[in-house]
Amino acid sequence: MMTRDQFVRQISQEQAALRRFLTALCCGNSTTADDMAQDTLLKAYMQLSQYDERKRFASWLMKIAYHVFIDNWRKLKSHAEEPIASAKFIQDAQQTDNAFRYQALYLALESLSEKVRITILLHYMQGYQVKEIAEITDATESAVKKQLSRGREELKKRLKDE
């Protein structure tokens, strides 16, 4: 079983990737992403006894983050009229061009179905392989491949229109 010190070391290595993943899922809303990251870390620590050390720690952590996101999304969906993605973009004059590019990307990602968006983010932002994504999202490898293909096509179409 992983010790507390080992857990802290692993978390420090994966924290930036976890935050990037959740920020992308939250369409750039870093406040919501930070809250979800805290929830994820707390759940991971509470479930540490369930971690199988034969598997990658990062995959296990992302699976927890995925479930935290889904839980939060469902809560917000049932309580709010607008989706999570009231994305906040950088107002700095120097970064306006980048903000517009990110905004277009976030809006394109937001237009994807939840499953496809998560699959795209895990693969292209986090670098996970199809097999790992299938494990994280409780899907088959075939379904993950279809979601990646569908997501690429949708993103091409939406970003081309921009």
In which residue ranges do the predicted regions lie?
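Acidic, proline/glycine-rich intrinsically disordered inter-domain spacer in sigma factors
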Residues: S86-E110
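The N-cap/first-turn positions of alpha helices
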Residues: K115-V116
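A short pre-motif secondary-structure segment
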Residues: T119-H123
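Short, charged helix-capping/linker segments at alpha-helix termini
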Residues: M1-R9, R20-D39, S49-Q50, E141
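Arg/Lys-rich amphipathic alpha helix in sigma70-family domain 2
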Residues: Q50, K63-E82, N98
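DNA-recognition helix of helix-turn-helix
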Residues: T137-D161
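Structural recognition of an alpha-helix C-terminal capping motif at a helix-to-coil junction
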Residues: D35-L42, K55-H67
